[in-house]
Amino acid sequence: MLHENKTPLTIVTGFLGSGKTTLLSNVLKDKSFAGTSVIINEYGQAGLDHRLIRRIEERTTLLSGGCVCCNRREDLVAELQDMLNAHQKGELPLDRVILETTGLADPAPILFSILTHPLLVHHFYIDMVIACLDAANGELHLQNNPESVKQIVAADRVIITKTDISSPEVVETLRQKIQLINPAAQISTAAHGQVGIDIFAAPIAPDIDRLQNLSATAGEHATNIHSMAIQFEKPLDWLAFGIWLSMLLQKHGESMFRVKGIVDVGELGPIVLNGVQHIIHPPQHLPDWRDYEERNSQIVFIMRDIQPQQILASLNAFQHLIGAEPEIKEICLDPFA
């Protein structure tokens, strides 16, 4: 298996006041998290959140005085190395690591630091990014704070928090906006910071049926973000597709916010594809298709300053160049135009 003998690392992000610490504090009380270590990054020098997670104080580390997405990444790497060393010496159980970012963090540089480090990549894998979005203030955060949008774009799962102080109509409107920003994300809700521990069951692939039913009506956002989901009816040549994707990210990596999907390469099971900006997670090979009703490739792209038609034209041109032209069923979601 791809992740055998590796420790999952979950990134929990979300804008300031979105309820990250409250949610973690409640979840970590479950006995199934007894072997979980937590790293909490706070922007200021005097940290507080780590003191709120008292249940696992001996396994909670504070990284303060800066954000791990920029000037504190070396501290994050050093802390993960220390955890690994302690675990190998038998001093620390390490079933999972959870990193809670600051409210101003962009998850992409954090992913880059972990996925490109020669030691960490052999001992840790990022199983998912969870983003919290405050139901009471989430719409304003998305409108006024680019960091909030980046957190949603990078997320595999988005949790709408504080639904206990928001109306169902507000929550539903926010859900629709999240779907339009990141069609690949799975969305949950939390009242009083309470969620099931199943939120840590990593999502694998986007729900194409849901994507097909989305209406692109949201969006009073004056932004240049576009999203698209495409479906291939025939197996893809994995080597050729990988070359095309690498070329695309090399040229447009900073503008390609998210690539996520499940790819049929003609084998017994699919390949799970997951990338943020120019960083692609190591592809995960699944043993079979038992969790999917249909056997086909489904891929979501979220990008800035790039029209969906440009991506499709580029892929079609490359497929034509190598003499492989699988049937493509495109779904263009362009809520921000």
Stretches with model-predicted labels:
Residues 40, 72, 99, 162, ...:
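Small/polar loops that bind or transfer phosphate-bearing groups
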Residues 2-18, 22-141:
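Nucleotide-state-sensitive switch-loop elements of NTP-binding domains
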Residues 144-146:
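Charged helix-capping and loop-helix junction motifs
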Residues 29, 36-37, 51, 89, ...:
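A generic "cationic amphipathic patch" detector
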